[in-house]
Structures are given as C-alpha cells and as structure tokens.
Amino acid sequence: LAENLAAAFGRPAWDISFHVNMDAASLIGMDTFVDGAVTFRPGPVYRCAQCGGFGVLDEINMAKNEALAVLHAVLDFRRAIDVPGYERIPLAEETRFIATMNYGYAGTRELNEALTSRFAVIQMPTITEENLEKLLRAQFADLTDKYVHQFALLFLDLQKKCDSAEISTKALDLRGMLDALRLRRRGVAAGPALDM
C-alpha cells in the first residue's frame, strides 16, 4: 500500500525497516571517513526529506523511543531535521512519511502518544474470504479452486480462533501461509510446509 501511494504520486520511496538496534544516526545520518576526511553520510530520513520522497517507516513499533524522537520535528509543524553538529534542514514540500506496524509480534510495543498523534492512524481491516481467494489465485495460478478455497477457509478459521483467544496469535500468519504454499511448489508435503 505504502509503495503504491508513492508510485501514484510519482515520488521516490525509501523503505526504512525498523529494528530494536535502530538509533537516530541510522535515520538521519552519521559521520564517516571518505578519503581521510570526516564527511556526513545522509541517512534515509534525511535523503527522503531533501528529495521530497515518501518515507515508509516499516514496523515502526520495533524501534526504541530514543531513535524515534528525531521524527517528532519531521512529522509536526516544524517539518525540519536537526542534524547535530551540522545544520537544520527543512523538508521538501512533497515529503511524506507512512508508518506501518503489526501488533502482537515479539519485540513490538505500543507507540508513545507524542509520536502517534503525528500520524493519521488507519486500522487496516482483516482480509475477506473473497479477497484472500483473489490473492491466492494471483500468487498461485497453479492452485485449483478447491485448494484455493480450502486454504482461504483454513486461514479464516485460524483467524476466528485467534480472535476468540482459543489459540495463540502466533498460529496466524498470512505471510507464513503463503510461504508454505511456495514450499509446496518445491515439493514439500503440506503438513511439514505449514509447520515451518
């Protein structure tokens, strides 16, 4: 979705994948040596801000608050980046940031209110049976309608059980099911493929 929005607006996109070891320098940039001299190497948020691109802040709820604090001035009325030891750069007018996150995965947490308030939060609905079957047909054209329907029902049944707390949410992973189907293509039996 985020990449499609960038393409629709004709803007370059930076995919910034967050993790627990992410720090402010990873986002805005850091000093490095080039030909024996100290030079500033811009990070993805800095480059996105200069070019008027779309910054896709992927899995933003994996990062620590200290790393995310640099985004506050970027995302509010200031629309600027303070680069310690260098300068304050304004964001190009076209610059936009889109954050994505999944709940309930290991290492994720709730975002603090100061950061959340700088975004328009869109809760994505869960996939419908019809759309799941379309996705399966698009990804696996060799799958018969019978199996497309069975895998869609399997996923939706697991989803219902997760929603009612009958099973762990770890059992439900659309990406995992798609990977299992790819393994099936390579000859792995259905049971072991789903176990992986």
What would you call each of these model-derived segments?
Residues 1-156, 163:
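AAA+ P-loop NTPase catalytic core and its hallmark functional loops
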Residues 133-196:
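Conserved AAA+ ATPase small/helical "lid" subdomain
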